[in-house]
Amino acid sequence: ARADPVRVPGAVQKLKPFMEEQAHHFLDRRIGDGHMDLVLDYASPVPAILTMKLMGLPYDNWHLYANLFHSVMALPQDSPEYAAAIGQAPALMQGVLDFAASRKAQPTDDLTSFLLQFEFEGRRLTDAQLLGIIWNLVAGGVDTTTSQTALTLLHLGTHPDLRQQLIDNPDLYRSATDELLRYFSVNQTLSRTVTRDVVINGQPLWRNDRVVISWLAANHDENEFDRPEQVILDRAPNRHLAFGLGPHRCIGSHLARLMAEVMVKAVLGRIPDYQVDVDNVRQYLGNPSMTGLAQLPVTFTPAAKRS
């Protein structure tokens, strides 16, 4: 039951006020300036703080985790900056284990406490298993939604007709969120190991072969989607695979979908005339299986903070 805030749509909705509060808080910090970076100033901190809340980690540490994962995705793997970012990981991992030890002594209703009490086949998780799961949850929480939101805001910022369509038709936010999930497929590929000899569409695959699944290709399959290279905000049906499939489907899909929707809606509601500084947009360079933005600078008409 304690995993419900991640897994169950109804429970995820209870987190919506917190998401909205954080979205507007970070917009308020820059809204009077008339310019901001929608990645560094907005799309990175908001999901990171929500992730801290779910895991039970201190809110004030959001930037430590967000900066690490953002740097690992954004920087070339052969750069000294990438090496420096990776070098921060062991201390953060130890911090996660120390935090878990404190939760073991005093459990609460967060996901870390749930994992500490979780049993599989009568056994609790080892420290290594616990660290691996928490690390993956934090990584997914602080980066993938950031990437999806940033790419969405870039696309809407450079396609004013779509942006205006969404502003004029707020009932489209849910379908638009799914359509842009399909279109970008932030987690573009996943590798798997073949468990038995099989032939698929005439191609033999042998046991223990490694294969790459392309979610991006599946989400742009002309046999499944009409005009797949076009963003259609009210596309229906939309059986995209942006969150994967089967037992490995993203556990936080409902959370990520709502968070992306809330953050995009807040931007279009508060700074609807934002203009993208396209010459200074920076793509991810660190991981070929992921897509996202390192920087998304924009300008807009300065506005007042929310009262």
Across the structure, where does each feature detected by a protein language model lie?
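Cytochrome P450
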Residues: 1-307
